[in-house]
Every structure is written in C-alpha cells, then in structure tokens.
Amino acid sequence: MTKTIAINAGSSSLKWQLYLMPEEKVLAKGLIERIGLKDSISTVKFDGRSEQQILDIENHTQAVKILLDDLIRFDIIKAYDEITGVGHRVVAGGEYFKESTVVEGDVLEKVEELSLLAPLHNPANAAGVRAFKELLPDITSVVVFDTSFHTSMPEKAYRYPLPTKYYTENKVRKYGAHGTSHQFVAGEAAKLLGRPLEDLKLITCHIGNGGSITAVKAGKSVDTSMGFTPLGGIMMGTRTGDIDPAIIPYLMQYTEDFNTPEDISRVLNRESGLLGVSANSSDMRDIEAAVAEGNHEASLAYEMYVDRIQKYIGQYLAVLNGADAIVFTAGVGENAENFRRDVISGISWFGCDVDDEKNVFGVTGDISTEAAKIRVLVIPTDEELVIARDVERLKK
C-alpha cells in the first residue's frame, strides 16, 4: 500500500486529494484558495471532518508546505516520506506529450513552453510541480495532460483549414481539453452499460464553467469541441466558444475594447459566454433563477447555451454514425436536471429521451426512458482518481 496525492494547481489555488493505492481509497482532500493574496484559506476534509484555517500564503511552495504539515497535524500521515508519488493535472501537452509522463529531464521546461497554448492554466500547473519538487524532491512526480486523451484524433479532425505552414511551423491544430474527464466517464459508461468499451460509441459532455464535448469510439477520442485552446467549442460560463473569426478584426477597427491581444483574450475568455449574454452571472444556478423570474437576457443566454450543445451532439452523432449513449458530467452536467432535460428534448428525434422521474438533482446512472435507443447517462467525473492511477502505473 502506498500514498499518492493528485494535484490541480490554479493561479491562486491548489486542489488536492490523497489516495491509498492501489485500493483507490480517498484518505483526505482539500483546497487552498487565494494563494498570493491576503487571508488565504486552507480547507482539509477527512474522516467526515472539515478543518479550515485562514492565513497568508505567498506562493505555491508555501501552499504545499502548509498542505503537507496539515496532513501530519491531523495524523493523516506520520512523515512526508509516506507520500511516494504525486500527480499533477496539466492542461496543455501539445504534440510533445501523448500520455502521462514522469517529470524528469526537460519535461517541466516543455510544460512551461506550452503555456502559449493554455496561458490561463499551464503556468499555474508548472508552479505546482516546482513546489512539490522543491519540498519532496525524491518522490515520483507525474504530469497528466488534459490533451493526451485527444491525441488519438485523426488528422482530418485536428487540422484546421489554414495554410499547412501554420501547422508544420507553428503547431496550430486542435488539441482539445478535459481529456482526463472524458476518458474516465467513458470507462464508467461501459461499466454502467455492461458492455466492452471497445464496442461502444459515446458522446461525453463535460459541462461545467468550462465545457467540452467529445466523440468517443472504441475508447478513443475521435473528435472534441475545444480546439487550439480551451476557448473553442460550445458556449461556456465566461468563454465564447466558437465564433466567426472575422468578428475580431472588425471589433479591433470599430471599438476601443480590442486594442491589444490581452484585450481580445480578456473579452473572449473572461467576459463572454453566459456572463456576457446575461449580463448577470456565469453560474448556471444564477441563470436558472433569473430565467424563473422572467429575465430576458438570462433566458436568451440559457437558450443559446443549450442550442450550441445540441448542435455539437448532433455533429458527433454524424461523426460516429450514431451513438450508444450520451454522457453528462461535471458541475452543470451532473447537477442541472432541467438543463439535461432541455438538451435531450431538442434532439429526441435521434432516439434519446429522458425519464423525468429518473432525471432529478443528485441522481447518477441511466436517466433514459425504457424505449430510448440512445441511453442518457449521468456519471460524476473523477479526474483525481485517473491522475492517481497514472502515478501508480509510472512509479519507478
């Protein structure tokens, strides 16, 4: 038995989960928020308890030190060296990394180089890796990439219709994201359906504040909605998803909001999507409450959101030539029952239908009617478990 920790480092946060492996038992989990800001918050959950402290945490190294000391303080571990492996979520692996990789040689430098593809994520992911390397230099460190699952896409799916030189020289292509989640729920769907994954055609919908949809055939990603960066694809909480590229030069010419690349990135990544259209919130719970109150902008934002998801599901039904199941996961996908109903009701012609008695808040499993040809599943994602499994597989 060994103890492995899965890490998801953000720019000002550190989410973690400690496992006993290979039993896959969660010993503790937690979240450190507001790193680099005053009154940082560290929360540790274990044995049915939740302990929280407020203190100033200047950087990720200090955050990791507090995390490790908390594990000792609460008698979850006796010493640092009880942890024998750490796995880090990294958003962009580019064409360098087709699978999870042990951190050695120039791996970390390449992760930082790939910040060009995920400027909001990779720098923070790399900071988490460096922090653990500084405090636990001798344990196995593994980087697990959101993009790895999508490296099975055929070239016709990942190439853009741009001059070839932009692919060969600049590596402009579709990379996708949320691959760890799509991979996990596809495997769980096969178990739920009682069929080999290799025999299934699935459409997995990871719908949270960010969102992506993937066509999965025989356990492999064959297409996915996110593109060169996590900005592409469906409409999201604060991101546009797909828009006509000509909008950008137009707004650069005729408004004062698009003067620099940073301006463009800010508007498209942080000020658009549900938030931009509703002028209210990026949170589906707030949107649904505003819709119930008759707010027109919130209603429009919700309708646009559902519409774009339906279109991608329809597109992937064509790519796969049908599907055995549509899977919903992540914050919105797992918890917003009205959203699931509305998405599926608009594509029922394909043979999918939701049973209203099964489609309730907190439900997991098959929510389809008995007669549905395409099953509709709700499966909680567990990216941390996939990370822990990969660490165990790659340990020295």
UniProtKB/Swiss-Prot annotation:
Q: Where does Mg(2+) bind?
A: N8, E383
Tell me a GO biological process for this protein: acetyl-CoA biosynthetic process
EC number annotated for this UniProt entry: 2.7.2.1
Asked whether the UniProt record includes Repeat among its keywords, one would answer no
List the signal peptide residues. none
Quote the PANTHER family the UniProt record gives: ACETATE KINASE, ACETATE KINASE-RELATED
Q: In which pathway does it act?
A: Metabolic intermediate biosynthesis; acetyl-CoA biosynthesis; acetyl-CoA from acetate: step 1/2
A single GO molecular function term of this UniProt record: acetate kinase activity
> Binding residues for ATP, per the UniProt record?
K15, H206, I207, G208, N209, G210, D283, M284, R285, G331, V332, G333, E334, N335
EC class: transferase
List, alphabetically, the GO terms of the cellular component aspect: cytoplasm
Instruction: Please list the cofactors this protein needs.
Output: Mg(2+); Mn(2+)
Which species does the entry assign this protein to?
Streptococcus pneumoniae (strain 70585)
Where is the protein localized? Cytoplasm
| Sequence similarity | Belongs to the acetokinase family.
Q: Which reaction does it catalyse?
A: acetate + ATP = acetyl phosphate + ADP
Quote the record's cofactor note. Answer: Mg(2+). Can also accept Mn(2+).
Q: What is this protein called?
A: Acetate kinase
